[in-house]
Amino acid sequence: MANVHDRLQKLAIILGGVLLTLLAMTADAVRQDLDAQWQSYADTQVTLEPAFTFPHATCFKAAALQYQLPETLLLAVARGESDFEPTARSRANAHGVMQILWPGTARHLGIHRLSDLYDPCTNIDAGARYLKELLNTYSGNMHLALAAYNYGPGRISKDGHNIPSGATWYSDYIFRHLNYVLGNGKGGKPIPDTLYSAIGQSTLLTFGEPYRAAAFIARLEKKAPSVSLDWFRRGTGEFEVVMTYAGRQEFDTSAGQLRNAGFRID
C-alpha cells in the first residue's frame, strides 16, 4: 500500500507540473495575442478620429496633444474605467473619469486634494500623464502599460512574464472598448458627429466575476449576432452587461432578437 501511495503522490506531482506548464503556455499565448492586437493598433490606427463625439471631448483632445498619446486610447480607458462619469468612485478608492487612485497615484501625479479628481479635465490630464509614464517605463508596449495602469507597475514585469490574469483581462477589456471608440462594433461606424450620450444602454445582467460576464456575452452573440452588446466594470466591482442601441427602433429590433434567443428585456 505504501508503494501505491508513493506512486500516486509522484503522479500527482507530475500532473500538477504539467498543468502549471499548460497554464503558463496558455497565458503566454494570450499575452502574445494581446501584444499583437495592441501593436497593430499602434502601427495602423492611432491617428484615427473617434467614431463618436464623446463627453469631455476638449479635455481628451488637450491631454492627447500634451502627452503625445492617441486620443482614442484615452477614450477607451475612460469608457472602460468610468463610462465618462466625473463623479465615479470605486470600492478600491479610485475616482473620476480615469479612476485615479487616492491618495497614492493622485499624489504621485501632483494632485493633493481629492476634490480635484472630480474635475474632468484635471482627472483626464492625470490619467494621460500616468499612462504616458507607464508607456515610457514599458518601452511603448501598450499591453504592459495598461496592465500596469490597472495593477500598478510594481506587479508588472518589464519582460511581460508572469502577469496576473486580472491585468491581462484588463488589457483585453480596454481593447474591446477601443473597438467601440473606433466604431468597429456590431453597428458599424455611426453617422459623423453622433453624440455618445445619444446611444442608449439597457442593462441585461450583472455578474460578480468578469469571466462570467464575458461568457454570457459570448453565448448571446452566437444566438443574436446582430445585437450590440457591451460590458462595464462598475464602481461596486461588479460587471454589468448592457445592450446598446441608437433610438427606439433599434431597441425594439434588438429586444425582439434577444427574446428569440431566450432572453427577455422587461
Predicted regions and their residues:
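Short, functionally critical alpha-helical segments immediately adjacent to catalytic or ligand/cofactor-binding
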Residues: L69-P86, I100, I124-A128, A145-G152, ...
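N-terminal Sec-pathway targeting helices
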Residues: A2-G17
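Export/targeting segments at the very N-terminus of extracytoplasmic proteins
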Residues: T26-F84, G185
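Substrate-binding/active-site groove segments that recognize
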Residues: R91-I111, A126-K132, A147, P153, ...
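Catalytic and substrate-binding regions of cell-wall glycan-acting enzymes that process beta-1,4-linked
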Residues: Q39, G140, L144-G188
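A short, structured beta-strand-centered segment in the mid-to-C-terminal lobe
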Residues: H112-N123
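Secretory-pathway/luminal and periplasmic proteins that interact with or process carbohydrate-rich
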Residues: S82-R89, L134, P153-D159
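Extracytoplasmic
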Residues: E209-D266
